[in-house]
Amino acid sequence: MIRIGSNLIKQSIKNTNKSGISRFFTTGSNNSTNYKPESCVKEEPKGKSVNVEDLKDQEIIALVDKGEIQPHNLETRLPNNFQRAVHIRRKLLARDLQKEHQRALHAQAVVAAAEKAATSGEDPSSIQPVVPPTSNLDFEGSLTNLPVDHFDYTKVLGACCENVIGYIPIPVGVAGPILLDGKLVSIPMATTEGCLVASTHRGAKAITKSGGAKTVLLQSGMTRAPVCRLPSSIRAGELKQWIENQENFYQVASAFNSTSRFARLKSIKVVIAGRLVYLRFKSSTGDAMGMNMVSKGVEKALEVITEYFPEMEVLSLSGNVCTDKKPSSINWLEGRGKSVVAEAVISGDIVRDVLKTTVEALVSLNIDKNLIGSAMAGSIGGFNAHASNIVTALYIATGQDPAQNVESSNCITLMESINGGKDLYISVTMPSIEVGTVGGGTHLPAQSACLDLLKIRGANLERPGANSEQLARVVAAAVLSGELSLMSALAAGHLVRSHLKHNRKTEAPAPQADTISMTHNLPHSD
Protein backbone atom coordinates (compact mmCIF):
# COMPACT_ATOMS: atom_id res chain seq x y z
CA MET A 1 0.00 0.00 0.00
CA ILE A 2 2.92 2.34 0.64
CA ARG A 3 4.10 1.65 -2.92
CA ILE A 4 0.69 2.64 -4.24
CA GLY A 5 0.82 5.85 -2.22
CA SER A 6 4.25 6.60 -3.67
CA ASN A 7 2.94 6.11 -7.19
CA LEU A 8 0.05 8.43 -6.39
CA ILE A 9 2.50 11.13 -5.34
CA LYS A 10 4.64 10.64 -8.45
CA GLN A 11 1.60 10.86 -10.73
CA SER A 12 0.48 14.02 -8.94
CA ILE A 13 3.88 15.65 -9.42
CA LYS A 14 3.87 14.61 -13.07
CA ASN A 15 0.49 16.22 -13.61
CA THR A 16 1.58 19.34 -11.75
CA ASN A 17 4.63 19.70 -13.98
CA LYS A 18 2.43 19.39 -17.07
CA SER A 19 -0.28 21.87 -16.26
CA GLY A 20 0.98 23.77 -13.22
CA ILE A 21 -2.08 22.53 -11.27
CA SER A 22 -2.48 18.87 -10.43
CA ARG A 23 -5.68 17.01 -11.36
CA PHE A 24 -5.90 16.21 -7.64
CA PHE A 25 -5.79 19.93 -6.75
CA THR A 26 -8.94 21.16 -5.03
CA THR A 27 -9.44 24.66 -3.63
CA GLY A 28 -12.28 26.83 -2.50
CA SER A 29 -12.26 28.47 -5.94
CA ASN A 30 -11.10 27.21 -9.30
CA ASN A 31 -11.07 30.54 -11.11
CA SER A 32 -7.28 30.45 -11.22
CA THR A 33 -7.32 27.40 -13.47
CA ASN A 34 -9.03 29.39 -16.23
CA TYR A 35 -6.59 32.30 -16.21
CA LYS A 36 -4.18 32.57 -19.13
CA PRO A 37 -1.68 35.41 -18.74
CA GLU A 38 -1.09 35.75 -22.48
CA SER A 39 -4.78 36.51 -23.02
CA CYS A 40 -4.33 40.01 -21.65
CA VAL A 41 -1.75 40.93 -24.29
CA LYS A 42 -3.20 42.50 -27.40
CA GLU A 43 -2.30 40.92 -30.72
CA GLU A 44 0.68 42.78 -32.11
CA PRO A 45 0.04 44.15 -35.61
CA LYS A 46 2.42 42.81 -38.22
CA GLY A 47 5.34 45.08 -38.96
CA LYS A 48 4.72 47.21 -35.88
CA SER A 49 6.68 46.83 -32.64
CA VAL A 50 5.11 47.32 -29.24
CA ASN A 51 6.52 49.90 -26.85
CA VAL A 52 6.70 47.98 -23.58
CA GLU A 53 6.36 51.20 -21.60
CA ASP A 54 2.86 51.65 -23.08
CA LEU A 55 1.68 48.29 -21.73
CA LYS A 56 -0.07 47.68 -18.44
CA ASP A 57 1.79 45.87 -15.67
CA GLN A 58 -0.21 42.68 -16.20
CA GLU A 59 0.56 42.76 -19.92
CA ILE A 60 4.27 43.03 -19.18
CA ILE A 61 4.01 40.13 -16.74
CA ALA A 62 2.37 38.11 -19.50
CA LEU A 63 5.33 38.83 -21.78
CA VAL A 64 7.63 37.63 -19.02
CA ASP A 65 5.62 34.42 -18.78
CA LYS A 66 5.94 33.93 -22.54
CA GLY A 67 9.71 34.36 -22.29
CA GLU A 68 9.73 37.53 -24.39
CA ILE A 69 11.08 39.57 -21.48
CA GLN A 70 13.52 38.28 -18.90
CA PRO A 71 12.77 39.45 -15.34
CA HIS A 72 16.32 40.72 -14.88
CA ASN A 73 15.96 42.86 -18.03
CA LEU A 74 12.88 44.79 -16.91
CA GLU A 75 14.87 48.00 -16.39
CA THR A 76 16.27 47.89 -19.93
CA ARG A 77 12.76 47.43 -21.33
CA LEU A 78 11.42 50.24 -19.13
CA PRO A 79 14.29 52.73 -19.43
CA ASN A 80 12.23 55.72 -18.36
CA ASN A 81 10.76 54.17 -15.22
CA PHE A 82 13.13 51.91 -13.29
CA GLN A 83 10.90 52.13 -10.22
CA ARG A 84 8.04 50.59 -12.18
CA ALA A 85 10.37 47.78 -13.24
CA VAL A 86 11.13 47.07 -9.58
CA HIS A 87 7.42 47.07 -8.70
CA ILE A 88 6.66 44.59 -11.51
CA ARG A 89 9.48 42.32 -10.35
CA ARG A 90 8.00 42.34 -6.85
CA LYS A 91 4.64 41.29 -8.30
CA LEU A 92 6.33 38.46 -10.18
CA LEU A 93 8.10 37.33 -7.02
CA ALA A 94 4.89 37.45 -4.98
CA ARG A 95 3.04 35.45 -7.63
CA ASP A 96 5.79 32.84 -7.80
CA LEU A 97 5.81 32.53 -4.02
CA GLN A 98 2.04 32.01 -4.15
CA LYS A 99 2.43 29.23 -6.72
CA GLU A 100 5.18 27.52 -4.76
CA HIS A 101 3.06 27.70 -1.63
CA GLN A 102 0.15 26.10 -3.47
CA ARG A 103 2.38 23.33 -4.78
CA ALA A 104 3.73 22.70 -1.28
CA LEU A 105 0.21 22.49 0.16
CA HIS A 106 -0.82 20.18 -2.65
CA ALA A 107 2.16 17.89 -2.05
CA GLN A 108 1.31 17.71 1.64
CA ALA A 109 -2.31 16.86 0.79
CA VAL A 110 -1.21 14.09 -1.60
CA VAL A 111 1.07 12.57 1.05
CA ALA A 112 -1.75 12.71 3.60
CA ALA A 113 -4.13 10.98 1.15
CA ALA A 114 -1.56 8.28 0.38
CA GLU A 115 -0.97 7.66 4.08
CA LYS A 116 -4.72 7.42 4.67
CA ALA A 117 -5.07 4.89 1.86
CA ALA A 118 -2.15 2.87 3.21
CA THR A 119 -3.61 2.66 6.72
CA SER A 120 -7.32 2.27 5.84
CA GLY A 121 -6.97 -0.11 2.93
CA GLU A 122 -9.13 2.12 0.73
CA ASP A 123 -8.62 2.45 -3.00
CA PRO A 124 -6.18 5.39 -3.43
CA SER A 125 -8.05 6.62 -6.50
CA SER A 126 -11.16 7.13 -4.39
CA ILE A 127 -9.41 9.55 -2.03
CA GLN A 128 -9.23 13.11 -3.34
CA PRO A 129 -6.54 15.23 -1.67
CA VAL A 130 -8.14 18.46 -0.54
CA VAL A 131 -5.95 21.53 -0.39
CA PRO A 132 -7.15 24.49 1.69
CA PRO A 133 -7.68 27.75 -0.22
CA THR A 134 -4.74 30.16 -0.22
CA SER A 135 -6.57 33.29 -1.33
CA ASN A 136 -6.21 34.71 2.17
CA LEU A 137 -2.42 34.67 1.90
CA ASP A 138 -1.02 37.95 0.61
CA PHE A 139 2.52 37.29 -0.58
CA GLU A 140 2.78 40.71 -2.20
CA GLY A 141 1.75 42.22 1.10
CA SER A 142 4.52 40.29 2.83
CA LEU A 143 6.99 42.51 0.98
CA THR A 144 5.34 45.69 2.28
CA ASN A 145 8.01 46.26 4.91
CA LEU A 146 10.74 46.06 2.27
CA PRO A 147 10.91 49.67 1.01
CA VAL A 148 10.72 50.24 -2.74
CA ASP A 149 9.74 53.87 -3.36
CA HIS A 150 11.75 57.09 -2.99
CA PHE A 151 14.98 55.58 -4.32
CA ASP A 152 16.98 56.44 -7.43
CA TYR A 153 17.32 53.07 -9.16
CA THR A 154 19.14 54.62 -12.12
CA LYS A 155 22.23 54.67 -9.90
CA VAL A 156 21.92 50.93 -9.25
CA LEU A 157 21.59 49.37 -12.72
CA GLY A 158 24.88 48.02 -13.98
CA ALA A 159 26.73 49.18 -10.89
CA CYS A 160 25.45 47.90 -7.57
CA CYS A 161 22.77 45.20 -7.77
CA GLU A 162 20.68 43.02 -10.08
CA ASN A 163 17.09 41.72 -9.90
CA VAL A 164 16.28 44.60 -7.56
CA ILE A 165 13.11 44.32 -5.44
CA GLY A 166 13.77 47.15 -2.98
CA TYR A 167 16.37 48.40 -0.56
CA ILE A 168 17.32 47.94 3.09
CA PRO A 169 17.34 51.00 5.37
CA ILE A 170 20.04 50.69 8.03
CA PRO A 171 20.28 53.11 10.97
CA VAL A 172 23.20 55.50 10.69
CA GLY A 173 24.71 56.96 13.83
CA VAL A 174 27.55 59.40 14.29
CA ALA A 175 30.47 59.04 16.69
CA GLY A 176 32.71 61.88 17.71
CA PRO A 177 33.79 64.32 16.59
CA ILE A 178 37.32 63.06 17.10
CA LEU A 179 40.34 65.31 16.84
CA LEU A 180 42.24 63.60 14.02
CA ASP A 181 45.55 64.99 12.78
CA GLY A 182 44.57 68.41 14.11
CA LYS A 183 41.04 68.51 12.64
CA LEU A 184 37.68 67.54 14.11
CA VAL A 185 36.07 64.66 12.23
CA SER A 186 32.62 63.12 12.75
CA ILE A 187 32.38 59.37 12.09
CA PRO A 188 29.25 58.03 10.30
CA MET A 189 28.44 54.42 11.21
CA ALA A 190 25.68 52.25 9.73
CA THR A 191 24.86 49.41 12.08
CA THR A 192 22.12 47.40 13.76
CA GLU A 193 24.23 46.55 16.80
CA GLY A 194 23.22 48.58 19.80
CA CYS A 195 26.03 50.12 21.87
CA LEU A 196 28.52 50.15 18.98
CA VAL A 197 28.14 53.83 18.09
CA ALA A 198 27.86 54.86 21.74
CA SER A 199 31.03 52.96 22.61
CA THR A 200 32.99 54.36 19.66
CA HIS A 201 31.76 57.84 20.59
CA ARG A 202 33.07 57.41 24.14
CA GLY A 203 36.47 56.38 22.84
CA ALA A 204 36.56 59.35 20.47
CA LYS A 205 35.65 61.65 23.34
CA ALA A 206 38.48 60.30 25.50
CA ILE A 207 40.98 60.66 22.65
CA THR A 208 39.89 64.22 21.82
CA LYS A 209 40.02 65.31 25.46
CA SER A 210 43.57 63.97 25.60
CA GLY A 211 44.80 65.93 22.59
CA GLY A 212 43.58 63.87 19.66
CA ALA A 213 44.81 61.03 17.46
CA LYS A 214 47.57 61.05 14.87
CA THR A 215 47.87 58.80 11.84
CA VAL A 216 50.60 57.81 9.43
CA LEU A 217 50.07 56.22 6.01
CA LEU A 218 52.78 53.61 5.52
CA GLN A 219 51.94 52.52 1.99
CA SER A 220 49.15 52.47 -0.59
CA GLY A 221 48.57 49.97 -3.38
CA MET A 222 45.86 47.58 -4.56
CA THR A 223 46.94 44.08 -5.59
CA ARG A 224 45.82 41.44 -8.06
CA ALA A 225 47.60 38.10 -8.51
CA PRO A 226 46.78 35.99 -11.58
CA VAL A 227 47.78 32.32 -11.57
CA CYS A 228 49.73 31.09 -14.61
CA ARG A 229 51.08 27.68 -15.59
CA LEU A 230 54.40 27.00 -17.27
CA PRO A 231 55.54 23.71 -18.84
CA SER A 232 57.97 23.09 -15.98
CA SER A 233 59.27 24.53 -12.73
CA ILE A 234 62.46 25.41 -14.63
CA ARG A 235 60.51 27.75 -16.92
CA ALA A 236 58.61 29.08 -13.91
CA GLY A 237 61.92 30.03 -12.31
CA GLU A 238 63.08 31.66 -15.54
CA LEU A 239 59.88 33.74 -15.61
CA LYS A 240 60.59 34.89 -12.05
CA GLN A 241 64.11 35.98 -13.00
CA TRP A 242 62.81 37.71 -16.13
CA ILE A 243 60.25 39.78 -14.21
CA GLU A 244 62.78 40.71 -11.52
CA ASN A 245 65.03 42.20 -14.19
CA GLN A 246 64.51 45.97 -13.93
CA GLU A 247 64.40 46.58 -17.68
CA ASN A 248 61.75 43.89 -18.16
CA PHE A 249 59.73 45.22 -15.24
CA TYR A 250 59.66 48.69 -16.81
CA GLN A 251 58.38 47.18 -20.05
CA VAL A 252 55.56 45.38 -18.22
CA ALA A 253 54.81 48.50 -16.16
CA SER A 254 54.54 50.62 -19.30
CA ALA A 255 51.84 48.32 -20.67
CA PHE A 256 50.08 48.19 -17.30
CA ASN A 257 50.09 51.97 -16.86
CA SER A 258 48.70 52.56 -20.35
CA THR A 259 45.28 51.29 -19.26
CA SER A 260 44.47 54.11 -16.81
CA ARG A 261 45.29 57.71 -15.90
CA PHE A 262 45.69 56.70 -12.26
CA ALA A 263 47.05 53.15 -12.25
CA ARG A 264 50.81 53.10 -11.71
CA LEU A 265 52.45 49.72 -11.23
CA LYS A 266 54.67 49.65 -8.15
CA SER A 267 55.82 46.06 -7.90
CA ILE A 268 55.30 42.46 -8.98
CA LYS A 269 55.87 39.77 -6.36
CA VAL A 270 56.43 36.33 -7.90
CA VAL A 271 55.28 33.29 -5.92
CA ILE A 272 55.98 29.80 -7.32
CA ALA A 273 54.40 26.44 -6.46
CA GLY A 274 55.74 23.71 -8.75
CA ARG A 275 55.13 24.98 -12.27
CA LEU A 276 52.40 27.38 -11.15
CA VAL A 277 53.34 31.05 -10.99
CA TYR A 278 51.39 33.69 -9.06
CA LEU A 279 52.20 37.26 -10.09
CA ARG A 280 51.11 39.69 -7.35
CA PHE A 281 50.81 43.07 -9.07
CA LYS A 282 50.62 46.10 -6.77
CA SER A 283 49.47 49.46 -8.15
CA SER A 284 48.33 52.88 -7.04
CA THR A 285 44.70 53.54 -7.98
CA GLY A 286 43.96 57.19 -7.25
CA ASP A 287 40.82 57.66 -5.17
CA ALA A 288 39.23 54.39 -6.31
CA MET A 289 39.48 51.22 -4.26
CA GLY A 290 40.88 49.99 -7.55
CA MET A 291 40.17 46.29 -8.02
CA ASN A 292 38.74 46.73 -11.52
CA MET A 293 41.44 49.22 -12.45
CA VAL A 294 44.23 46.85 -11.44
CA SER A 295 42.56 43.88 -13.13
CA LYS A 296 42.45 45.80 -16.41
CA GLY A 297 46.13 46.67 -16.11
CA VAL A 298 47.04 43.07 -15.28
CA GLU A 299 45.36 41.82 -18.46
CA LYS A 300 47.47 44.20 -20.56
CA ALA A 301 50.65 43.31 -18.68
CA LEU A 302 50.08 39.59 -19.23
CA GLU A 303 49.93 40.21 -22.97
CA VAL A 304 53.50 41.54 -22.84
CA ILE A 305 54.75 38.68 -20.66
CA THR A 306 53.15 36.13 -22.99
CA GLU A 307 55.18 37.51 -25.89
CA TYR A 308 58.33 36.32 -24.12
CA PHE A 309 56.78 33.21 -22.60
CA PRO A 310 54.30 32.05 -25.28
CA GLU A 311 53.88 28.67 -23.60
CA MET A 312 52.53 30.33 -20.43
CA GLU A 313 48.86 29.59 -19.70
CA VAL A 314 46.87 32.19 -17.78
CA LEU A 315 44.56 30.03 -15.67
CA SER A 316 42.75 32.81 -13.83
CA LEU A 317 43.03 36.56 -13.44
CA SER A 318 42.82 35.97 -9.69
CA GLY A 319 44.85 33.20 -8.11
CA ASN A 320 44.03 34.03 -4.45
CA VAL A 321 47.49 35.42 -3.68
CA CYS A 322 45.93 38.90 -4.06
CA THR A 323 44.18 38.20 -1.49
CA ASP A 324 40.62 39.52 -1.75
CA LYS A 325 37.84 38.89 0.79
CA LYS A 326 39.68 36.03 2.49
CA PRO A 327 41.98 35.87 5.53
CA SER A 328 45.62 35.63 4.47
CA SER A 329 49.08 36.10 5.89
CA ILE A 330 50.27 37.97 2.79
CA ASN A 331 47.84 40.87 3.39
CA TRP A 332 48.80 40.93 7.05
CA LEU A 333 52.54 40.98 6.33
CA GLU A 334 52.81 42.92 3.06
CA GLY A 335 49.64 44.98 3.07
CA ARG A 336 46.89 45.59 0.55
CA GLY A 337 45.09 48.86 -0.10
CA LYS A 338 46.17 51.38 2.54
CA SER A 339 48.47 50.56 5.47
CA VAL A 340 47.80 52.94 8.36
CA VAL A 341 48.87 53.39 11.97
CA ALA A 342 46.72 55.48 14.33
CA GLU A 343 47.93 56.42 17.80
CA ALA A 344 47.01 58.52 20.82
CA VAL A 345 48.18 59.27 24.33
CA ILE A 346 45.36 59.16 26.89
CA SER A 347 45.98 60.97 30.14
CA GLY A 348 45.53 59.01 33.33
CA ASP A 349 42.78 61.39 34.46
CA ILE A 350 40.74 60.68 31.30
CA VAL A 351 41.27 56.95 31.72
CA ARG A 352 39.89 57.22 35.23
CA ASP A 353 37.08 59.76 34.72
CA VAL A 354 35.82 58.97 31.19
CA LEU A 355 36.80 55.33 30.67
CA LYS A 356 36.26 54.32 34.32
CA THR A 357 39.32 52.09 34.55
CA THR A 358 43.08 52.33 35.08
CA VAL A 359 46.10 52.44 32.80
CA GLU A 360 47.55 49.35 34.45
CA ALA A 361 44.35 47.35 33.95
CA LEU A 362 44.12 48.30 30.26
CA VAL A 363 47.74 47.41 29.48
CA SER A 364 47.48 44.08 31.28
CA LEU A 365 44.18 43.10 29.64
CA ASN A 366 45.42 44.05 26.18
CA ILE A 367 48.35 41.65 26.58
CA ASP A 368 46.22 38.83 27.97
CA LYS A 369 43.34 39.20 25.51
CA ASN A 370 44.45 40.83 22.26
CA LEU A 371 48.00 39.49 22.12
CA ILE A 372 48.22 36.18 23.99
CA GLY A 373 44.57 35.20 23.51
CA SER A 374 44.65 35.82 19.77
CA ALA A 375 47.99 34.00 19.47
CA MET A 376 46.57 30.96 21.25
CA ALA A 377 43.65 31.02 18.80
CA GLY A 378 46.07 31.01 15.85
CA SER A 379 44.67 34.32 14.62
CA ILE A 380 45.91 36.03 11.45
CA GLY A 381 45.60 39.78 11.84
CA GLY A 382 43.09 39.45 14.65
CA PHE A 383 45.10 40.91 17.51
CA ASN A 384 42.34 43.32 18.49
CA ALA A 385 39.05 43.49 20.37
CA HIS A 386 36.53 44.28 17.61
CA ALA A 387 38.08 46.20 14.74
CA SER A 388 35.71 44.60 12.21
CA ASN A 389 32.71 46.10 14.02
CA ILE A 390 33.86 49.63 13.30
CA VAL A 391 35.27 48.87 9.84
CA THR A 392 32.01 47.30 8.65
CA ALA A 393 29.82 50.08 10.04
CA LEU A 394 31.94 52.72 8.33
CA TYR A 395 32.09 50.73 5.10
CA ILE A 396 28.31 50.40 4.84
CA ALA A 397 27.83 54.08 5.61
CA THR A 398 30.33 55.27 2.99
CA GLY A 399 29.52 52.87 0.14
CA GLN A 400 32.51 50.54 0.44
CA ASP A 401 32.41 46.80 -0.25
CA PRO A 402 31.34 45.32 3.12
CA ALA A 403 32.84 41.93 2.22
CA GLN A 404 36.28 43.51 2.24
CA ASN A 405 36.04 43.94 6.00
CA VAL A 406 37.69 40.48 6.07
CA GLU A 407 41.13 41.85 5.18
CA SER A 408 40.46 45.49 6.04
CA SER A 409 39.90 44.52 9.68
CA ASN A 410 43.44 43.16 10.03
CA CYS A 411 44.61 45.03 13.11
CA ILE A 412 46.96 44.78 16.06
CA THR A 413 46.12 46.92 19.08
CA LEU A 414 49.02 47.87 21.33
CA MET A 415 48.90 49.60 24.72
CA GLU A 416 51.73 50.83 26.93
CA SER A 417 51.96 52.78 30.14
CA ILE A 418 54.12 55.89 29.70
CA ASN A 419 55.22 58.91 31.73
CA GLY A 420 56.05 56.79 34.73
CA GLY A 421 52.89 54.72 34.41
CA LYS A 422 50.64 57.75 34.64
CA ASP A 423 49.35 57.87 31.05
CA LEU A 424 48.33 55.37 28.36
CA TYR A 425 49.81 55.06 24.87
CA ILE A 426 47.51 53.21 22.45
CA SER A 427 47.93 52.41 18.77
CA VAL A 428 46.27 50.36 16.06
CA THR A 429 48.25 49.12 13.06
CA MET A 430 46.07 48.21 10.08
CA PRO A 431 48.04 47.02 7.02
CA SER A 432 45.20 46.33 4.58
CA ILE A 433 42.44 48.94 4.62
CA GLU A 434 40.68 48.76 1.23
CA VAL A 435 38.67 51.91 0.56
CA GLY A 436 37.76 54.33 -2.20
CA THR A 437 35.78 57.55 -2.57
CA VAL A 438 34.76 56.88 -6.17
CA GLY A 439 33.22 53.76 -7.71
CA GLY A 440 31.18 50.99 -6.12
CA GLY A 441 28.42 52.26 -3.85
CA THR A 442 30.05 55.62 -3.16
CA HIS A 443 27.82 57.35 -5.74
CA LEU A 444 24.54 56.33 -4.06
CA PRO A 445 22.80 59.32 -2.44
CA ALA A 446 22.95 58.22 1.21
CA GLN A 447 26.51 56.99 0.96
CA SER A 448 27.54 60.17 -0.84
CA ALA A 449 26.04 62.17 2.03
CA CYS A 450 28.23 60.32 4.53
CA LEU A 451 31.30 60.99 2.39
CA ASP A 452 30.25 64.65 2.27
CA LEU A 453 30.12 64.58 6.06
CA LEU A 454 33.79 63.59 5.96
CA LYS A 455 34.51 66.15 3.18
CA ILE A 456 35.99 63.48 0.91
CA ARG A 457 33.29 62.63 -1.66
CA GLY A 458 34.55 61.86 -5.14
CA ALA A 459 38.04 62.23 -6.55
CA ASN A 460 40.57 64.72 -5.28
CA LEU A 461 41.51 66.68 -8.40
CA GLU A 462 44.46 68.51 -6.84
CA ARG A 463 46.11 65.39 -5.42
CA PRO A 464 44.60 62.14 -6.76
CA GLY A 465 44.36 59.56 -4.00
CA ALA A 466 44.19 62.05 -1.13
CA ASN A 467 40.48 61.47 -0.44
CA SER A 468 40.76 57.70 -0.23
CA GLU A 469 43.86 58.05 1.95
CA GLN A 470 41.93 60.32 4.32
CA LEU A 471 39.10 57.78 4.49
CA ALA A 472 41.63 55.11 5.48
CA ARG A 473 42.94 57.41 8.22
CA VAL A 474 39.38 57.93 9.47
CA VAL A 475 38.82 54.16 9.54
CA ALA A 476 41.96 53.66 11.62
CA ALA A 477 41.06 56.48 14.02
CA ALA A 478 37.54 55.11 14.43
CA VAL A 479 38.95 51.66 15.18
CA LEU A 480 41.31 53.25 17.70
CA SER A 481 38.28 54.81 19.42
CA GLY A 482 36.33 51.56 19.42
CA GLU A 483 39.25 49.55 20.76
CA LEU A 484 39.91 52.00 23.57
CA SER A 485 36.29 52.08 24.71
CA LEU A 486 35.55 48.35 24.53
CA MET A 487 38.79 47.37 26.25
CA SER A 488 37.97 49.86 29.00
CA ALA A 489 34.49 48.37 29.40
CA LEU A 490 35.96 44.88 29.63
CA ALA A 491 38.61 45.97 32.11
CA ALA A 492 35.98 47.66 34.28
CA GLY A 493 33.41 44.87 33.90
CA HIS A 494 30.87 47.22 32.29
CA LEU A 495 30.24 45.31 29.06
CA VAL A 496 27.09 43.45 30.04
CA ARG A 497 25.50 46.46 31.72
CA SER A 498 26.13 48.72 28.71
CA HIS A 499 24.58 46.21 26.33
CA LEU A 500 21.54 45.80 28.51
CA LYS A 501 21.08 49.56 28.26
CA HIS A 502 21.77 50.08 24.53
CA ASN A 503 21.13 46.73 22.83
CA ARG A 504 17.58 45.86 23.90
CA LYS A 505 14.13 46.89 22.74
CA THR A 506 12.79 49.68 24.90
CA GLU A 507 9.51 47.88 25.43
CA ALA A 508 11.19 44.79 26.86
CA PRO A 509 11.87 44.94 30.62
CA ALA A 510 15.50 44.36 31.55
CA PRO A 511 16.21 41.08 33.37
CA GLN A 512 17.05 41.18 37.05
CA ALA A 513 20.75 41.72 37.62
CA ASP A 514 21.17 38.52 39.60
CA THR A 515 19.87 36.42 36.68
CA ILE A 516 22.38 37.70 34.13
CA SER A 517 25.38 35.52 33.36
CA MET A 518 28.60 37.23 32.37
CA THR A 519 28.39 35.65 28.90
CA HIS A 520 24.86 36.89 28.20
CA ASN A 521 24.33 39.35 25.35
CA LEU A 522 27.97 39.84 24.44
CA PRO A 523 28.67 41.75 21.22
CA HIS A 524 29.28 39.85 18.01
CA SER A 525 32.99 40.65 18.34
CA ASP A 526 34.44 41.36 21.74
UniProtKB/Swiss-Prot annotation:
A cellular component term (GO) from this record?
Answer: endoplasmic reticulum membrane
The record, for PROSITE patterns, names: HMG_COA_REDUCTASE_1, HMG_COA_REDUCTASE_2, HMG_COA_REDUCTASE_3, HMG_COA_REDUCTASE_4
Question: Pathway membership of this protein?
Answer: Metabolic intermediate biosynthesis; (R)-mevalonate biosynthesis; (R)-mevalonate from acetyl-CoA: step 3/3
Q: Which residues cross the membrane?
A: none
* Record's keyword terms, sorted: Cholesterol biosynthesis, Cholesterol metabolism, Lipid biosynthesis, Lipid metabolism, NADP, Oxidoreductase, Steroid biosynthesis, Steroid metabolism, Sterol biosynthesis, Sterol metabolism
Catalytic reaction list: (R)-mevalonate + 2 NADP(+) + CoA = (3S)-3-hydroxy-3-methylglutaryl-CoA + 2 NADPH + 2 H(+)
Q: Name one Pfam family in it.
A: HMG-CoA_red
Q: Which SUPFAM superfamilies match?
A: NAD-binding domain of HMG-CoA reductase (SSF55035), Substrate-binding domain of HMG-CoA reductase (SSF56542)
Q: Which InterPro entries match?
A: HMG_CoA_Rdtase, HMG_CoA_Rdtase_cat_sf, HMG_CoA_Rdtase_CS, HMG_CoA_Rdtase_eu_arc, HMG_CoA_Rdtase_N, HMG_CoA_Rdtase_NAD(P)-bd_sf, HMG_CoA_Rdtase_sub-bd_dom_sf
Q: Which GO terms describe its biological process?
A: cholesterol biosynthetic process; coenzyme A metabolic process; isoprenoid biosynthetic process; sterol biosynthetic process
UniProt-annotated catalytic positions: E193 (charge relay system), K325 (charge relay system), D401 (charge relay system), H499 (proton donor)
Q: What is its EC number?
A: 1.1.1.34
Q: Please provide, alphabetically and separated by semicolons, the GO molecular function terms listed in this UniProt record.
A: hydroxymethylglutaryl-CoA reductase (NADPH) activity
Region entry Disordered, spans: 503-526
Q: Where is the composition biased (Polar residues)?
A: 514-526
Gene3D superfamilies referenced in this protein's UniProt entry, alphabetically: 3-hydroxy-3-methylglutaryl-coenzyme A Reductase, Chain A, domain 2, HMGR, N-terminal domain, Hydroxymethylglutaryl-CoA reductase, class I/II, NAD/NADP-binding domain
Function statement? This transmembrane glycoprotein is involved in the control of cholesterol biosynthesis. It is the rate-limiting enzyme of the sterol biosynthesis.
Family from the record: Belongs to the HMG-CoA reductase family.
Q: NCBIfam families, alphabetically?
A: HMG_CoA_R_NADP
Q: What is this protein called?
A: 3-hydroxy-3-methylglutaryl-coenzyme A reductase 2
